[in-house]
Amino acid sequence: DVERSRGLGDVYKRQFQYKSDAEHYYAALKERMAKFNLELEESKSRLIEFGRYAEQNRRARGLGKPETFEFLGFTFYYGKSRKGYPWPKVKTSRKKFEKKLREFKEWLYDSKNQPAKDIVKQLNVKLVGYYRYYGVSFNVYKLSAFLHRIQQFLFKAMNRRGCRRTYTWNGFIDMLKYYPLAKPKVYYPLY
């Protein structure tokens, strides 16, 4: 009696220029996997229209904006370049963004009784790790939003030390001048 293993076999995406090619590949992939007693997870497998013509094709059919997809913690979508051309872009996926915020918030509240210098030092290590993974082209807005939320959590955590308020917002900003938080930057330019 062999127990079936569950989990991620592989996470990958394929791109095709024509819908017929994608449908043919999808059918062949299912058939090929069946030979090895494997199957695709239907809820996680789909064909989407994605590319420079997706917006105008969907608009012509009255379907609205092009679909997006999530892959490795990023949401892939089509936006516009500075010159107005359709351009593939990425941003941190909402689920991963919120999950990391909860983790950072929990850590900050657990560490709030340490000296401010130590908290900021450890926080910077964590922030740089986050930036190094999510620091890609077109994602600076989400990185800046993440830093802003972390600053708010840090302010609240610092004010929950003891019975009285430790910092006003201006005092907190002054403290950050002495112990600055790591700023987001693009580590991996994609284009």
Where are these regions (language model features)?
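Single conserved hydrophobic/aromatic residue that forms the stacking wall/gate
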Residues: 1-12
